[in-house]
Amino acid sequence: MKGTSALLLIGFFHATISQDPGGTVVIGSLSGRKRGNLNTGGQITSNSAILGDVNAGSKLSEPPKRRNTDKTARMLENNPRIGGSLIPPPGVIMEPNPYDINPPYFVSNKNSQSTNSATNTMLQSLTSDTKTTTRTSQTSSTRASSSITQGINTMNRNSMRFNQVDRNKISGFVNSGGQIQTNPLNTNSQSSPILAAQRQITRQKSENTQGNSIVRNGGTNSLNIPSSTRRSQPPNMAVQIGQNTATFNMGTDGKVLHKFLPTNLFENINSVSKEPRNTASVPGIGGMRNPGPSISIRNIFGTNNIEGSSVQLTGSSGVFVSDPGPKGNPTDVPQFVPSGISPTVRDPNALDPFKSIRNQIVPDIKRNEVNRGNSMISAPVIDNPTNSNSMVELNSILQNVQNGFLSEALGNSNNQNNRVTNIVNQINSADPQPVRRCQFLPYRDLRTNKIDRRYFRQLVNGKWLNLKCADGAGFNETTCLCSIHLTGDAQCSPEVRLNFNDGTIQNLTPINVHIDAEGVDASKGWAHFNGSTQMKFEYFNAYDVQRDFLIKLRFKADSYIPNQSHPIVTNCVAGQENTDPSIGVFLTGNYPHKIVFILQTDKSKLLQHLIFDVPRDGWHDITYKYDGSTLTGILDGKEKSLPTEGRIENRQAVLVFGGCGNRIFRGNIDDIQIYTCIPPSHRNKG
């Protein structure tokens, strides 16, 4: 690239980059005004528009001296803290983060405290000689029609490229919203205006760590981040913390997932996933494979950078999560999960957050659109951005880029990898832009006060409904999906469970199941049927059971009617006695009495059945099971089975206990369990 120039695009701005034969990269505006130089091979020069420069080579330069230190201090003092972000997001103010101990300084205008969109936000740079104001375009509605390529291009020590640049100016290092103020973190100069301003602020407000003041510990080494300053509590912000991720929320139409795997961020978080990296995905539920450590930008900037921490960006249309590929592969891209995906049974056509985005929603990524002829990291394209969210996302991307340069500079210059990791992860943990709340809540069992992840809650028409995840999956409030892999019997739980112990007829599972049991008496701890009462489950009305189905119960018959069958449980159609049910357990009235299990599938021409002799008196345990290939019946521990295939035929009927139509049952039923899956404990036996 010697002696050439290339057009860069970041956000809605234009600028040029040129590189002289000596290796100095100059970033400037179309007007020719230089904002700062980046030398990937040596020292960085600076001018009045940049307070401190980042050197990606072997030496960090010190910022130029400023004459008006008092003014600098006042501006620093009066400007809000935005989570210690290197790039203050346009129009978004973040609350102070208690983990934000000593991040690099930045400056923003008080106007940025408003919630105006990025097109109405102005950020004022901090200089003593020149007041430089970055103005966003007044014709943003027109420029918003152009697409933003959201991503991070390949960077190394010989080249620096970005996808989009502000069409008016580049202010500072890499920033589409305003001036970036970056401190050299190894300066001990007593004349540094930053340190002078810091000492003055510290003297005035040594105890104040909240509000809009920027307060530091003071001293020449105040910009170091010792590990001893870690706190044991999570950040004081809207955040949901999972085992390996945190979801930050600030209510601007989305959310950001932040992977904070490094141990230096939270003491109880491991830097490496304990699960196997390539755990096989379980079909039908999606998101089951443990992703392992985040790729972050480590694979982009080399080996001396961030150890496993990254920000996954979002837009109004969904959430990005990480999909690490082979170690060191720099072509991994964020994976996209649409916000409309329900955490219930996954549609086979729905996007899988752990499969390649290129094969799902962006099959035609223009890999060389900006960097023609050169390799670049592919990323989704956001078309027609019309609000500040796109700018917030873009700023977050650019910040990751700058963090990479910062990490590279410190790693090469001081060879303090741990310090680099601490600094960059503190920055990353402080500034993700939360954008959307999860519309579901985990289900908490009020009896045990424990969360049961097999279920989740959704607010529908002002009422909370309890819903069930797909079999084998558990609800994860961080991903807002049923993305947890359950093991053991937790893989399969009953839709309905009744024991009548308290004299009431109530489903003991979290699922909202209406039970019509008028006249059924449960006062003795079981359900009593007198021959004119039934218990109906509308939940299974025309229910498409398909294959897996299991019912367990206990019964005791009081009387029998010769030449008549007594339905204990069926899905028979009332008023259509000539239509056989496709599911049923019957007791015959003739002596010797028998129990009959019946099944009708779409592939069986005849009604399949199993017959057991049953003693006249006493309680009896029965289990009815069909797993798609075998009908199994169990009576008091005795098991019979019949090979059968096909799906259970649907009936436009509810599931009924205690009779159907003119067929009645007199007796007691207890301990009812209904499954639409086969629990592991019943897979190799009845």
Swiss-Prot record:
One of its GO terms (cellular component) is extracellular region. Residues 1-18 form the signal peptide. InterPro entries: ConA-like_dom_sf (IPR013320). It is found in: Secreted. Residues 34-73, 125-148, 201-236 are annotated as: Disordered. Residues 37-49 have a biased composition (Polar residues). Residues 62-73 have a biased composition (Basic and acidic residues). Prismatic layer of shell (at protein level). Expressed primarily in the mantle with highest level in the mantle edge and lower level in the mantle pallium. Keywords: Secreted, Signal. This is Asparagine-rich protein. It comes from Margaritifera margaritifera (Freshwater pearl mussel).
